[in-house]
Amino acid sequence: MIRFLVLSLLILTLFLTTPAVEGDVSFRLSGATSSSYGVFISNLRKALPNERKLYDIPLLRSSLPGSQRYALIHLTNYADETISVAIDVTNVYIMGYRAGDTSYFFNEASATEAAKYVFKDAMRKVTLPYSGNYERLQTAAGKIRENIPLGLPALDSAITTLFYYNANSAASALMVLIQSTSEAARYKFIEQQIGKRVDKTFLPSLAIISLENSWSALSKQIQIASTNNGQFESPVVLINAQNQRVTITNVDAGVVTSNIALLLNRNNMAAMDDDVPMTQSFGCGSYAI
């Protein structure tokens, strides 16, 4: 009888400690610190299969079959309310999310495909009235990214908005979600800027927006440089932390050696190039990516 009880407890313990889906990543805002946020982003990067490394930067896979193409991120706000976010592991692109028994997917072909594999047991499926393209989200929100606060308190508010699905502020919340997960995984600078705001918010700098808009271009040029003696075929212009334009021409630049943390595979670039606005306003003028 005692042996049976011990065996039963052991089985129960194994069941409870086994993650529901291999590769899932979780982050709780209650008690969160800069360090715990950094661990979360590190775990997210590790959950993304890579083809190989170029200049010590993981090159994401160009494709994966079926459900292997997707991973889940579980985010819990200060009120202990959780949403599960589905991402495409080939580009860290968010497909949709689930709150309770309802799933929400972007209005685009890639998200429709993802819905065949994730959140299939949700009792209700909602197609959002926009795609995950920043330009579409900014239009729906009625504001640009530069005017939407980031930081862990902002992430908490975004989770709450999405958990209860407030249609009026969902687009803004989704931009906070994208930048706090996908963009932070792509760039160490964005991870650090968000992670150090544990108890306050901030407006994203032009440097952050510049990096977000240039991930595809940087990824492409770094891949070209790997067979071109470290030189870019076409320069990439960024805005640095001092709001100055800088031209990146080779892999010795700081953005390559100590910032970009993931590379988009060149085979996936046509789709990603449609996902960011090609012209971003800076001050009184305009800066074309």
Swiss-Prot record:
<keyword id="KW-0732">Signal</keyword>
<dbReference type="InterPro" id="IPR016139">
    <property type="entry name" value="Ribosome_inactivat_prot_sub2"/>
</dbReference>
<dbReference type="Pfam" id="PF00161">
    <property type="entry name" value="RIP"/>
</dbReference>
<protein>
    <recommendedName>
        <fullName>Ribosome-inactivating protein alpha-trichosanthin</fullName>
        <ecNumber>3.2.2.22</ecNumber>
    </recommendedName>
</protein>
<feature type="signal peptide">
    <location>
        <begin position="1"/>
        <end position="23"/>
    </location>
</feature>
<dbReference type="InterPro" id="IPR017989">
    <property type="entry name" value="Ribosome_inactivat_1/2"/>
</dbReference>
<feature type="active site">
    <location>
        <position position="183"/>
    </location>
</feature>
<feature type="propeptide" description="Removed in mature form">
    <location>
        <begin position="271"/>
        <end position="289"/>
    </location>
</feature>
<comment type="similarity">
    <text>Belongs to the ribosome-inactivating protein family. Type 1 RIP subfamily.</text>
</comment>
<dbReference type="GO" id="GO:0030598">
    <property type="term" value="F:rRNA N-glycosylase activity"/>
</dbReference>
<dbReference type="InterPro" id="IPR016138">
    <property type="entry name" value="Ribosome_inactivat_prot_sub1"/>
</dbReference>
<keyword id="KW-0800">Toxin</keyword>
<keyword id="KW-0611">Plant defense</keyword>
<keyword id="KW-0378">Hydrolase</keyword>
<keyword id="KW-0652">Protein synthesis inhibitor</keyword>
<dbReference type="InterPro" id="IPR017988">
    <property type="entry name" value="Ribosome_inactivat_prot_CS"/>
</dbReference>
<keyword id="KW-0930">Antiviral protein</keyword>
<dbReference type="GO" id="GO:0050688">
    <property type="term" value="P:regulation of defense response to virus"/>
</dbReference>
<dbReference type="GO" id="GO:0006952">
    <property type="term" value="P:defense response"/>
</dbReference>
<dbReference type="GO" id="GO:0017148">
    <property type="term" value="P:negative regulation of translation"/>
</dbReference>
<dbReference type="InterPro" id="IPR001574">
    <property type="entry name" value="Ribosome_inactivat_prot"/>
</dbReference>
<dbReference type="GO" id="GO:0090729">
    <property type="term" value="F:toxin activity"/>
</dbReference>
<dbReference type="InterPro" id="IPR036041">
    <property type="entry name" value="Ribosome-inact_prot_sf"/>
</dbReference>
<comment type="function">
    <text>Inactivates eukaryotic 60S ribosomal subunits.</text>
</comment>
